């Protein structure tokens, strides 16, 4: 007894778990019933992971579990409902990556308990097929347009006209959802709900139904449905705007701007709870914004709108054909008798193109005629597909097709049961079943191998996409080395520029010295015995060693230098400039020595006083103070740099 009591309490806790978590979110403080209902149902949708399943996956689950062949008023047990929900979540986990797998057992328990609480309040343990379809189609994810198209297919007849009785039944089932989250007083079912949607009793086609349901505003009883879809779209929208009440620096979700107060904007939490401050009042009209535009985009849009460049708004939904597609005529096809425990497997094998044993189709002598009719129907169906692009888009057509297949399968099973078969048929059926089992086993093994290979490739892709710690550690080192190399490059470029500038200054000094020496040699009245009177100054000897500046050519480095130095250094692009400079300095020194000798021989006759300079190897004449003087700067023979020679090595001539 104690164990039974504990199990009952555990079961009751599981049934109330979703509602306890929903109350913890404190949605009841939202003052507007529409937003309060939409937030609660959105919470249930996300908590049950229904937002990951779209309407097409729901339709596939309905067909896999045979709900499309059942009448809407048929009741199913809770155990079968649990099977349907389990197939939905297990198929969902197959589509999701391994890193985003959901807890299937928990999701099944939450959704099953919520559906029982919403649609089986009396505790009968049974739900109608239409209730299950309406609830799952409303609460699943995906586009609202696709949901409404599927819902209309469940409420329309073969001519594509909506049946108001079916619409009333749908509203009765759909409005049980707000009642389940304690919003029945605001959005409970009433007998006049159909008239609020379609006041005029007239023929309602698909396009008119979509226009009404997707209008702004929508019907009052279903106003929470499009709002729930908008909540899903703006959950992650970021607004870099400060809230005027709570002063948060940014907003997520909806943003509300007052139409009367200047630059007064509220986040969704403050607006939903009715907060207001300053001159703003809750009675002011607010505009709901689901995105943020920069001032530049606003200005561009305003200019485009004023110039008429803004395109017209697209319609809320495409226009669908008024007449529904006619279902396929399968009267000439007699499908094979499905096995009791292999129905789903055989359907999957036939759809995947795997050849199945054809001997099971030979139930009589008219088998060639049946195959001929089947091929003719397939050919006509292919021709129809080539001319119609929306054949496969109609859920009603597929439902009728499955219903027709099931009816012929049942008739074939009844005929086969009444037939008396010879003993050879039993052995043949046994062989056919054995072949089927072998084929199924082979396909299951192959499917298992394919799933393992997919899992392995997925793990390799995830490992390759994630950065390893070694790469993360190498990146700072590489950045530091790159920074040092750039710094070293800048230093070398600065050093090279300084050397080029020093070299140019030295060339300018040499040019001035050579001009001065040439002028002195030309103006001298006496000549040396070893030098003729009209002989010009000897040019420096060119060096044969190769070498050039890496970034500047010879003409660039000698810019601003006179013709004599350029003539001495311009030729020979591959030589050592340092050695050339030393050779040029030696030649100038020799020329100076010759000039001093000539001056000494000439001045000895004019001036009797001669003084000897300790810095000069030859006696130098003492020139009067009024004589012009010049200074020549020579590079030292012991240095190997291109910088100017210090004053201690300078020779002065008077």
From Swiss-Prot:
Main function: Scaffolding protein that assembles DMD and SNTA1 molecules to the basal membrane of kidney cells and liver sinusoids. May function as a repressor of the SYN1 promoter through the binding of repressor element-1 (RE-1), in turn regulates SYN1 expression and may be involved in cell proliferation regulation during the early phase of neural differentiation. May be required for proper maturation and function of a subset of inhibitory synapses.
GO molecular function annotations of the record: DNA binding; phosphatase binding; zinc ion binding
Subunit description: Interacts with dystrophin short form DP71 and syntrophins SNTG1 and SNTG2. Binds DTNBP1. Forms a specific complex composed of DMD, SNTB2 and SNTA1 in neuron; the interaction with SNTB2 and SNTA1 is DMD independent. Interacts with UTRN and dystrophin short form DP71 in the kidney and liver. Interacts with SNTB1, SNTB2 and SNTA1 in kidney and liver. Interacts with KIF5A. Interacts with HMG20A and HMG20B. Interacts with OLFM1. Interacts with PRKAR2B and PRKAR1A.
InterPro entries: Distrobrevin (IPR017432), EF-hand-dom_pair (IPR011992), EF-hand_dom_typ1 (IPR015153), EF-hand_dom_typ2 (IPR015154), KCMF1/Dystrophin (IPR050774), Znf_ZZ (IPR000433), Znf_ZZ_sf (IPR043145)
Coiled-coil intervals, chain numbering: 429-519
Binding-site positions, Zn(2+) 2: 258, 261, 280, 284
Modified positions (Phosphothreonine) in chain numbering: 11, 69, 179, 212, 424
Segments of this protein annotated with the region Syntrophin-binding region: 399-448
Record: residues binding Zn(2+) 1: 243, 246, 267, 270
One of the GO biological process terms: synaptic signaling
Location of region: Disordered: 520-562
Location of this chain's protein in the cell: Cytoplasm; Postsynaptic density; Cell projection, Dendrite; Basal cell membrane
Keyword Cell membrane: yes
Positions of ZZ-type zinc fingers: 238-294
Family affiliation: Belongs to the dystrophin family. Dystrobrevin subfamily.
Protein name stated in the entry: Dystrobrevin beta
Modified positions (N-acetylmethionine) in chain numbering: 1
């Amino acid at each position: 007894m104690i164990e039974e009591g504990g199990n009952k309490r555990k079961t009751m806790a599981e049934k109330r778990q979703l509602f306890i978590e929903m109350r913890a979110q404190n949605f009841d403080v939202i003052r507007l019933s529409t937003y309060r209902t939409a937030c609660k149902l959105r919470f249930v949708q996300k908590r049950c992971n229904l937002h990951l399943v779209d309407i097409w996956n729901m339709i596939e689950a309905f067909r896999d579990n045979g709900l499309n062949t059942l009448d809407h008023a048929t009741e199913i047990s809770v155990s079968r409902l649990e099977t349907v929900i389990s197939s939905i979540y297990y198929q969902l986990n197959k589509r999701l990556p391994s890193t985003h797998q959901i807890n299937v057992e928990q999701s099944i328990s939450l959704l099953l308990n919520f559906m029982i609480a919403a649609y089986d309040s009396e505790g009968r343990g049974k739900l109608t097929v239409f209730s299950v379809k309406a609830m799952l189609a409303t609460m699943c994810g995906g586009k609202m347009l696709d949901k409404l198209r599927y819902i209309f297919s469940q409420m329309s007849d073969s001519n594509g006209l909506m049946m108001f009785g079916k619409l009333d039944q749908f509203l009765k089932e759909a409005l049980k959802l707000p009642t389940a989250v304690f919003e029945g007083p605001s959005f409970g079912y009433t007998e006049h709900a159909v008239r609020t949607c379609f006041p005029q009793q007239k023929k309602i086609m698909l396009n008119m139904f979509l226009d009404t349901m997707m209008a702004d505003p929508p019907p009052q009883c279903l106003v929470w449905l499009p709002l729930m879809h908008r909540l899903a779209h703006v959950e992650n929208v970021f607004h870099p705007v400060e809230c005027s009440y709570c002063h948060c620096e940014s907003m997520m979700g909806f943003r509300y701007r007052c139409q009367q107060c200047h630059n007064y904007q509220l986040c969704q939490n403050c607006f939903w709870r009715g907060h207001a401050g300053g001159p703003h009042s809750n009675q002011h009209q607010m505009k709901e914004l689901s995105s943020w535009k920069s001032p530049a985009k606003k200005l561009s849009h305003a200019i485009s709108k004023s110039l008429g460049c803004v395109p017209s708004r697209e319609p809320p939904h495409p226009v669908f054909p008024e007449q529904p597609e006619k279902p396929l005529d399968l009267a000439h096809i007699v499908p094979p008798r499905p096995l009791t425990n292999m129905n789903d497997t055989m359907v999957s094998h036939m759809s995947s193109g795997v050849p199945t044993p054809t001997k099971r189709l030979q139930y009589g002598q008219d088998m060639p005629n049946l195959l001929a009719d089947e091929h003719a129907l397939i050919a006509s169906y292919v021709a129809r597909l080539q001319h119609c692009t929306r054949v496969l888009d109609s859920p009603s057509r597929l439902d009728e097709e499955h219903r027709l297949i099931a009816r012929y399968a049942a008739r074939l099973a009844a005929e086969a049961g009444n037939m008396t078969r010879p003993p050879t048929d039993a052995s043949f059926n046994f062989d056919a079943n054995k072949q089927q089992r072998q084929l199924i086993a082979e396909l299951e093994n192959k499917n298992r191998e394919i799933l393992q290979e997919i899992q392995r490739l997925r793990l390799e892709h995830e490992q390759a996409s994630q950065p390893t710690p070694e790469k993360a550690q190498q990146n700072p080192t590489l950045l530091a080395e790159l920074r040092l190399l750039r710094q070293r490059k800048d230093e070398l470029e600065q050093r090279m520029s300084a050397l080029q500038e020093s070299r140019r200054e030295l060339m300018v000094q040499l040019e001035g010295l050579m001009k001065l020496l040439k002028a002195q040699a030309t103006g001298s009245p006496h000549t040396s015995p070893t030098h003729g009177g009209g002989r010009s100054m000897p040019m420096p000897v060119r060096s044969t060693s190769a070498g050039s500046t890496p970034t500047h050519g010879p003409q660039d480095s000698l810019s601003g230098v006179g013709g004599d130095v350029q003539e001495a250094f311009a030729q020979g692009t591959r030589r050592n400039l340092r050695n050339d400079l030393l050779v040029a300095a030696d030649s100038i020194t020799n020329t100076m020595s010759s000039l001093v000798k000539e001056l000494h021989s000439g001045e000895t006759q004019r001036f009797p006083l001669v003084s000897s300079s300790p810095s000069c190897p030859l006696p130098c004449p003492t020139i009067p103070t009024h004589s012009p003087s010049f200074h020549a700067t020579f590079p030292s023979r012991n240095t190997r740099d291109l910088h100017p020679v210090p004053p201690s090595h300078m020779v002065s001539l008077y």
